[in-house]
C-alpha cells in the first residue's frame, strides 16, 4: 500500500524525522527557508511502511511532517466529496 509523506514549510531542518525513519524514506535537501538551510524530503515514499515514527520525532508544535496512510490519504487531504 502506498502512503503519502507530506513535508510542510514549518520544517526547522533538525533531521529528527530522517534519523527516526527505519526505512530510509527521508533525506535532507538544501533549503533557504530556515536557519538550518535544509528541509526534509521524501524521495522514497514507496518504501514507507506507515509507522509514523517521523511524525513522533518532529519537535515542532505543528507537525512539519505527516504520513497519510493508504485509504486515509484522499479523505485527510480533502480530496473526497
UniProtKB/Swiss-Prot annotation:
Its EC number is 1.97.1.12. [4Fe-4S] cluster 2 binds at residues 21, 48, 51, 54. The lineage of its organism: Eukaryota, Rhodophyta, Bangiophyceae, Cyanidiales, Cyanidiaceae. It comes from Cyanidium caldarium (Red alga). The eukaryotic PSI reaction center is composed of at least 11 subunits. GO terms for biological process: photosynthetic electron transport in photosystem I. It catalyses: reduced [plastocyanin] + hnu + oxidized [2Fe-2S]-[ferredoxin] = oxidized [plastocyanin] + reduced [2Fe-2S]-[ferredoxin]. Gene3D superfamilies: 3.30.70.20. This is Photosystem I iron-sulfur center. It is an enzyme of class 1 (oxidoreductase).
Amino acid at each position: 500500500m502506498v502512503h503519502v509523506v507530506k513535508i510542510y514549510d514549518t520544517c526547522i531542518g533538525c533531521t529528527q524525522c530522517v534519523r527516526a525513519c527505519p526505512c530510509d524514506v527521508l533525506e535532507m535537501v538544501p533549503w533557504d527557508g530556515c536557519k538550518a538551510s535544509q528541509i526534509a524530503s521524501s524521495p522514497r515514499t514507496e518504501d514507507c511502511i506507515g509507522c509514523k515514527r517521523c511524525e513522533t520525532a518532529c519537535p515542532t508544535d505543528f507537525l512539519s511532517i505527516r504520513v497519510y496512510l493508504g485509504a486515509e490519504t484522499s479523505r485527510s487531504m480533502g480530496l473526497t466529496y
